[in-house]
Amino acid sequence: MDSNTVSSFQVDCFLWHVRKQIVDQELGDAPFLDRLRRDQKSLRGRGSTLGLDIEAATHVGKQIVEKILKEESDEALTMTMASTPASRYITDMTTEELSRDWFMLMPKQKVEGPLCIRIDQAIMNKNIMLKANFSVIFDRLETLILLRAFTEEGAIVGEISPLPSFPGHTIEDVKNAIGVLIGGLEWNDNTVRVSKTLQRFAWGSSNENGGPPLTPKQKRKMARTTRSKVRRDKMAD
């Protein structure tokens, strides 16, 4: 096992513990709390994958951080903070939309790289809007927190979320997953639009009809998803 992978996990565990103390003292806002909950799931998955105990890793992570802070000068810290751009948290969804439980009449789940796509195949002939909460850096999507598909009535009919056991994803991973989700929804004659905020930070542009400017590769992925469903339906008949 790579030592950097282990030390990164240990430091992440300790930093999560510090952030938890901030929340316990009621000093964190809603986005801070949301990231804390999702990072907890991610750490549990990573710990299981690496075979490491989170409590023990937290103690080692504390030692690593204390050693770095002891050697770090205030001047170096100021220079680092000044040269590192800060990420922003973008919220398409309200706290209620983000935390609401939902269920599927005809569930389908697909793993696309480090992301999990869930869709209710019972939904037909609906106008659907994709909205997401995510972080942004350099005016580009950095990390997807959660994406959900909503009908005009407000029902949740689809979702894209990071896999807790597979930390890290790229903007291309997110766009590919969105392409698969759109393909699955459009197969049932639904009309799918993407929020302007998500279009702007994922694709760098917005489309008036709400459709994302998918690349040829993403369109081929949508087509493959649709064709595989056609074959399964024929076999079922």
UniProtKB/Swiss-Prot annotation:
This is Non-structural protein 1. Residues 1-73 are annotated as: RNA-binding and homodimerization. The gene is NS. GO terms for biological process: symbiont-mediated suppression of host cytoplasmic pattern recognition receptor signaling pathway via inhibition of RIG-I activity; symbiont-mediated suppression of host gene expression; symbiont-mediated suppression of host mRNA processing; symbiont-mediated suppression of host PKR/eIFalpha signaling; symbiont-mediated suppression of host type I interferon-mediated signaling pathway. Residues 205-237 are annotated as: Disordered. Its main location: host cell. Inhibits post-transcriptional processing of cellular pre-mRNA, by binding and inhibiting two cellular proteins that are required for the 3'-end processing of cellular pre-mRNAs: the 30 kDa cleavage and polyadenylation specificity factor/CPSF4 and the poly(A)-binding protein 2/PABPN1. In turn, unprocessed 3' end pre-mRNAs accumulate in the host nucleus and are no longer exported to the cytoplasm. Cellular protein synthesis is thereby shut off very early after virus infection. It is found in: Host nucleus; Host cytoplasm.
